[in-house]
Amino acid sequence: MFLATLPIDQAVGHILRHNIVDAAGHKVLPKGKRLTDDEVTRLRGLGIAAVRVAVLEPGDVHEDEAARRLAAVVCRPGVTATEAVHSRVNLFAEADGVVEVDGAALLAINTIDGLTIATLPNHALIRRRKRVATIKIIPFALPKALVQQAERIGFEAGGVVGVRPLLPRRVGVLLVASPEARERITRLVLPAIESRVAELGSMVCAVRYVKPDEHEVAEGIAALRADGNDLLITAGETSIMDRDDVTPQGIRLAGGRIEHYGAPVEPGNLLLLAYLEDGTPQGMPIIGAPGCVRSRATNIVDLLLPRLLSGERVTRRDIIELGHGGLLER
């Protein structure tokens, strides 16, 4: 592709580089328009003798075709691409879910001059029909070799952006508190947990109370598991203060494994994540919620719960990586 200013009679088939306006300032033709005979005649009637155009050369790929081709290899399951309009394709979520972005592939494609992809943050919660990403081709055309380079990156990565749908899960809540504090803890903690879970398409199906004793915690976990719950959330009078505190000990007695304790996220530093193995790739997650779970202000639980409810097995490394952006200012 090269840029030129051509006499109007030589402009047919080339791409208009700038908007054309009439004497009153009204737009006659938009930039990016491939000029036809009729449009050239119209411009001649306005007294226009020459126009600035982009001239495509053999091997060039028009901006809209380039955007379509890139979208075809960028999309992972869970997203739908629009038609290309003005060199842009938007990707929308097919269902409520969690955004998945291959950051390395995204960086590699965006390094190619003239190609851009902007996405929501990896692991962000997304709602159905909301925009997840946008593809924009900068010039009016790209050399075929650059488009093919981007296609190879997307193909080898298995796509760049997708949405893992939220699954309707049964959630059990274990409240660890003395009998004297149960009413207060229930009032402070349970509504916030129930509303969080409901907003993500799942339901709190069982609530059990135990005293702060590791054996009672283990029995409560076993009972909630037997009730058919898919995910457990524990909360209590205080946050879990150590890997060997009462709740972690109870989780181990119940057969669980502590994945990680302590998160580089504020609010939510005193988070615990554990799993009970159940024969599935994810296992049964157990969130040991910190005290901030009582508030509906965004905290560590809001970062992890959607991912767990979409079936992801969140790891120690995943939690550690939350430190970049982990200061959640209220």
Q: Where do the model's predicted regions map?
A:
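Phosphate-binding glycine-rich loops and their immediate beta-loop-alpha structural context
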Residues: 139-231
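Generic structural signal for well-ordered, non-membrane alpha-helical segments
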Residues: 36, 59-67, 122-125, 186, ...
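Phosphate-interaction motifs
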Residues: 1-148
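Short, glycine/charged-enriched secondary-structure capping and boundary segments
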Residues: 43, 149, 186-189, 246-249, ...
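A generic local secondary-structure boundary/capping motif
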Residues: 78-81, 120-124, 137-139, 157-165, ...
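Flexible, glycine/charged-enriched surface loops at secondary-structure junctions
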Residues: 53, 79-84, 142-144, 203-207, ...
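Short glycine/threonine-rich loop/turn motifs
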Residues: 178, 205-330
